[in-house]
Every structure is written in C-alpha cells, then in structure tokens.
Design a protein with these regions (language model features):
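Helix-loop-helix junctions and helix-breaking kinks within/between transmembrane helices
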Residues: 34-43, 102-108, 184-190, 213-249, ...
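Alpha-helical transmembrane segments of multi-pass inner-membrane proteins
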Residues: 134-159, 182-228, 232-246
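Aromatic-anchored transmembrane helix interface
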Residues: 77-90, 98-123, 132, 136, ...
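N-terminal signal-anchor transmembrane segment
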Residues: 1-64, 88-92, 386-388, 401-403
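Hydrophobic transmembrane alpha-helices and their immediate junctions
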Residues: 76, 237, 241-249, 256, ...
C-alpha cells in the first residue's frame, strides 16, 4: 500500500471552497429566524445538487460508459429501500388517520428517501476524489468546532446565535450548559463533530504533512467534549485506532509528529476534560455547568433515562406500524429517544427489521469493497459507531452520518474516467 496514498490526489483551492460550504450546510442544517422549513440550508443544498445532477450528470449516470459498478448498484439499492419505507409509511399513515396523536413518521421517511437515498447519488458527482471530500469535511468540522468553542466561552457569541438562528434542542442557546453550534446542538452536534474526526484521521495517516490535521483533530475533539459525551467518547476510541494505524502504516515523520504534538495536546485536553466533569467552581466559565447540577439535569444517567421512557408492547399495531415515532395510538404509547424503538413504533417491527438489516448489510458490503486498507478500517469503525449510536438516538434519520459514510465509500474507488471537470 502506498504510504502517502492521498498526496497524489488533487484538491484545487477554488473548488475546495464551495465544496466546504456544500458539506457544511448539508451536515449542519442552518435555519435563520423567519426562514421557512423548506428553505433551510440542507434543503437548499439538496435542491442545487438535484438540479445539477438532472441537468448535467443524469445522462452520464445512465450511459454504458459509466463503469463505477459499485456506486451505481448501491445508489439504486439505497433508492429502492427508501421508496419501500416511504410507500409503506404512506399506507400506514392513511390507515391510522385520526386514530392517534404524536410526532408523525411520514415526514422522516420522505426526507430519508430524498436526503439519503437521492442526495448520496447526487453528491458523488461533486467530488473528483476522496481527498476533496475528506478536506471539505475536515474544514467544515473545524469551522463548526470554532463556533462551538466560541459559543461556550463567549456570552456575546451565544446571544448572537440565540437572536439569529433556530436550533433543534431541549434547551435554548442561553439556557444550556453545553456548547452549541450553528444549526445543531446536543448529542446530534456531538455525533456530527465525530463524523468530521473520521476524515481527519484518514488525512493524518494518508498525507505526508499531517501536523495541521493533528492540531485540527485536537480542536474538534475539544469541541466535542464541550458539546456532549457521545461524540467525545467515540472520538477517543477513534484516536486510539488512528494511533495504532499510524504506527503500523505511517512514516517516521508521521509517528514523530503524532507522538510529540499528540502527547502535549491530549494532555491538555484530558486535563480540561477532568475539570469539565468535576465540581470545581473556580475554573472560569465552567461554572455554567453547576447551574444545571443544582436542578439535577447534569447528573442524569442516559441509560436510566432510556429505561424510564415508555415503549409500546408488540401487537398488531406495532408489528405493522402506527405512523408515529413518538406518541399514542389506540392506548399504545412510545416516548423513547432510541432510534431503533422509534422506528419500531412508527414503521412497525417487521419493516424496521428489514430496513436496518438491509441498510447495515449495504454499508458492510461497501466497506468490504474499499481497496485501501486504512480507509476500509476507519470507515468500518464509522459503520460500527453508526450501529451503536442509533441505539441512543435516531441519527440515521438526521441524514448526516449516512451521507458521510456512503459518499466516502463511493469516492474511495472512483474511477479516473469519471472525474468531473
């Protein structure tokens, strides 16, 4: 395997700039106050990508000369499973019309079809190689990390975000002990930051000059610490894996830079982590955490909370689906935050098993198809993280993780003749 397998891939600066915005405004759904839901940043990016695909790349995708067989096969399967789930949910919604109340599943399945099944296909044509996508994800995540850190330590930044942008979170910008970002917050933001750590890890191993990416990894991981434990813990596990891969496949320069910078940087990081999870009142801005400890919010245990949430038993309704991912139908109630249980209540047990089995099988096949060993291992770790994280919250129906995973898999083996000029 080529030690610096990313050095020979080109990433022109002009193209990289709009690719960064393309990635940032899809992964993080930015919505200023007064802007309707149909015009959030994620949906605007989808409209642009869809229009460009139809007008420029549809003929190429359908032509006999298009020889990226894995991409074509996987994208069609993604669209197929998206259509099946959406059509089934449409039928269930019609059958249960007026019989229950809660948060409907129909919109989630429609957006999965559009923002995962179709958008992953559209996005393939916006990047010439895997390095362009990795760099776009890296810089987009660094930008978000800077915003998170500024939000945590600067009240002025927090007020600015509070006055100008909507956020999907349990608490507003001014009432949270955690750092918030632009267009995302809490555990979803933590997972999205982790999504940026995976491309950063690949860049650290695959580029001969990796010092900048090591600093970037530390900054993103620190932001994840301020946001939520899920992304931070996954980032630490990914760090351990990355260090192992560097010492197996990396050069002496890569090993030295990671050892020196990493030791100093992560010593500081873990020192801050120890303070962050402690009750030390004297440490500057961390006093904001204690306000939540006084009312017991900070000490809640995630596992205990999930156990206390109502889950409907298996019956005919939950076998076929109720059309609500959280709510009450014919006396059955589910209020769970777990992605698997929300799908079970909304789509039904049968379709949920089929959906996750088919999707995870497709993800596993795409990981095995990757030729580069380092990328294969790190995207395999991302796959396992997605499976694990879905047990906490419905991250798959927030679309960022499937977008990053599938697009990285597609671009890893993109044929040279399919490059876009």
């Amino acid at each position: 395997m080529n030690r610096y397998f990313l050095d020979d891939q080109k990433a022109p600066l002009k193209k990289l700039i709009w690719q960064i915005f393309f990635v940032f405004f899809f992964v993080y759904e930015v919505q200023p106050f007064g802007v309707p839901d149909m015009l959030t940043s994620r949906k605007i990016v989808f409209y642009i990508a869809g229009f460009t695909f139809i007008t420029r790349f549809l003929k190429r995708f359908n032509s006999k000369t298009f020889d990226d067989v894995n991409f074509k096969r996987t994208s069609k399967k993604l669209i197929s499973i998206g259509f099946v789930v959406f059509l089934w949910q449409t039928l269930i919604t019609l059958l249960h019309s007026g019989t229950g109340s809660g948060q409907p599943m129909w919109g989630k399945t429609l957006l999965f079809l559009l923002l995962t099944s179709f958008f992953c296909t559209f996005s393939y044509f916006f990047f010439n190689n895997i390095k362009q996508f990795l760099l776009a994800m890296f810089y987009a995540t660094v930008i978000q990390s800077v915003i998170c850190i500024a939000d945590f330590f600067s009240f002025e930044v927090k007020v600015f975000l509070y006055n100008h942008f909507m956020v999907d979170a349990n608490f507003g910008y001014l009432s949270s002990s955690r750092a918030y970002g632009l267009g995302a917050a809490e555990s979803l933001l933590a997972i999205n930051l982790f999504l940026g750590l995976v491309p950063t890890a690949i860049l650290i191993i695959g580029c001969s000059k990796n010092v900048f990416y090591i600093f970037g990894y530390i900054a993103i991981l620190f932001a994840a610490l301020l946001v939520g434990s899920t992304g931070f813990i996954l980032g630490i596990l990914l760090l351990i894996l990355t260090i192992g891969l560097v010492f197996i496949y990396g050069s002496f320069y890569q090993k030295s830079s990671l050892a020196i910078i990493g030791t100093v940087g992560f010593f500081i990081l873990f020192s801050l982590a120890a303070v962050f999870f402690s009750d030390i009142e004297e440490f500057g801005n961390f006093h904001k955490i204690l306000a939540f400890q006084e009312v017991g919010i900070e000490n809640q245990n995630t596992v205990h909370t999930l156990r206390e949430q109502a889950v409907a038993p298996i019956c005919l309704h939950t076998l076929l689906g109720t059309s609500y991912y959280r709510g009450t139908v014919d006396g059955l109630t589910t209020m769970s935050d777990t992605g698997y249980l929300q799908s079970y209540f909304g789509n039904g047990l049968i379709l949920t098993l089929v959906f996750y089995f088919y999707l995870y099988r497709l993800m596993f096949i795409n990981v095995r198809y990757i030729k580069n060993r380092v990328i294969c291992i790190l995207l395999g770790f991302l796959f396992l993280s997605i499976v694990f994280a879905e047990g906490k919250e419905p991250y798959i129906y927030h679309y960022g993780n499937t977008f990053v995973f599938f697009l990285a898999c597609f671009l890893s083996n993109k044929p040279h003749k399919q490059l876009i000029k």
